[in-house]
Amino acid sequence: MGQQQLLLIILGVIVVGIAVAVGITMFSDSATNANRDAITNDLVNLASRAQQFYRRPTSLGGGGNSFVGITKDAAGLAKLTNKPSNGNAVYSISAAGAGTGTASTVEIEGLGNETGTDGSTPVKVHVKVFASTDSVWVLN
């Protein structure tokens, strides 16, 4: 009888260990997905601000139907937001509307604080902003 009880205790410990491991994995996946969704939401908001800049006349501090002025540095990002990072990610301009003429796109990237699907690098989401639309894709 003592041996049977010992086997039941060992079996119970194994089952609890497996349940804890599965729970941790599910929590980690959920945290990654939540971070990815939050970054996507922030990027769509920044894309909307970039489109507002595009449409705003140059006399009012906008682009005058161009993304020229939204540069890859802090000054370019400051035209879209005064907070280049938040609890979700750090944001940057990955391809700017810099140069002369009419720049037709700008690309913004968010680097999250959770590990992405590859298991080693952070979540990364990218948005390409056009004059009247945007395209979002998840890089990790």
Predicted regions located by residue number:
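N-terminal alpha-helical signal peptides/signal-anchor transmembrane segments
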Residues: D42-T58
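Glycine-centered small-residue hotspots that permit tight backbone geometry or close packing
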Residues: M1-G2, A95
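Periplasmic/extracellular, small/polar-rich flexible segments of pilin-like filament-forming proteins
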Residues: R55-N140
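General structural signal for alpha-helix termini and helix-helix connectors
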Residues: D29, N33, R56-S59
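C-terminal juxtamembrane segment of a hydrophobic transmembrane alpha-helix
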Residues: Q4-T32
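Membrane-proximal amphipathic alpha-helices
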Residues: T32-L43
